[in-house]
Amino acid sequence: MAVDAHDLDHRARNLSGCIPPELVSRLLELGHTEVVELHAGRGEWFCAPAWARLLGERDRQADASEVLAPYLATGWWTAVEAAAELLEAWGRAGEAIAITRARMEAGHPLALECHARLLARNGRAEEAFTLLRPHIGELSLAAALVDVAADAGRDEEAAALVSARTGHRCSDFPWCCRGFDRETALGLLARVRERQGRVDEAIALLRAGSTTSTSDAERLAALLARHGRLEELRETAATDDSVYAVQQLAGLLEERGDVEGAIAAYRQVGGAVAPDPHAAFELARLLARHGRGDEALDVMRVQASSRGGDDWILRTLSLLYLDQGRPGDGLAHLDALAVACGGEEEWDLYSIRLPLISARDGVDEAVAQARGHPEGTSSYAALHLAELLAGAGRTEEAVAVLLPREQPRPGRVPHGPRPHR
């Protein structure tokens, strides 16, 4: 088997001409490991780490390493990272450290963070901190430094390094600071203080940043929820525009057994039927979790009526109909919306019907109707058809739908720049 980093990267990024990760997971759930094994050896990247992981669980680590070897030999970072993850899980951290160090020394832009975190997880946090310290001005590496500082016993040094950034005022975000602005620095400093048990200081830091930063507002809500600060969380949720604080409040109330309080928190976002679509989505999930499927359907039907063109809302509604064993009612609702929109549906909307058709009329009818759609032979339609077929246990057909008869030879994919190797 010959594989090429450029070809692998293109197919993995675009999910084109390959078996996607969702289908690989589905194949394994259904027990079709032989299909995953076969295609792992045929250049199907998403099959390879899944099969290698299974082999490792069966104490066949040498065989697992052989599965990944052709991909690893290309120098493709995704393969290096996957191999390091498996080696660490098998108790072979030294080998994992060695392969990530090689990519770091070669200058791969993602390798330093991965290598440092790997060191820290395996008793070498001091070394990781030292590696990261010169890169404090780079956001992802600063976050990694804060994370490894605790095990390195250098929390105060990390706090001092991050504090120096809290005075920065952006003049041309993100170019003036590469995304590492004052609010982000406050969030990182709050992470250190919370870890040290100085929760009130962490809250004060996030409050200072939350007036101008959505991220800090979300961090504040999550922090309050983690520490059970219910009344402060209520106050934060009352002025929350992103619904994130409301979600944290509802989650805390549900965790404490106050389901009605959690429902009320979502319903207060704009009115009795939760017209904010994100609050409605979370409310519907909450109701469904507690056996109130009809109420969940009512919530999402209101959303579908007012925002009929939003495919994620219709998809959520359709899944609720499926969960309630009412595929026919779901199709009737979609039919009514289609008529209101002129009777034509692009594939993104039409594909929502397929699981409902399959549940009511069988997978063959769903596939036939899908192929009759003007976009039914497209590559993106193939993903949906494959999911239907795999769900019915027809794995060979599912794979055949996805894979082109003649895959491009390594090195001949002309799309985009070559990945960093």
Each model region followed by its residue ranges:
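Residue at a conserved register position within TPR or TPR-like alpha-solenoid repeats
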Residues: L27, H39, L55, L87, ...
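Alpha-solenoid helical repeat scaffolds
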Residues: E37-G41, A69, R101, R133, ...
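Generic helix N-cap/helix-start motif at coil->alpha-helix transitions
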Residues: A12-P20, R42-P49, T74-E81, A106-E113, ...
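N-terminal alpha-helical scaffold/docking segments in eukaryotic complex subunits
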Residues: M1-A64, H415
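Conserved small-residue packing positions in alpha-helical repeats and bundles
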Residues: A12, L23-V24, V36, A52, ...
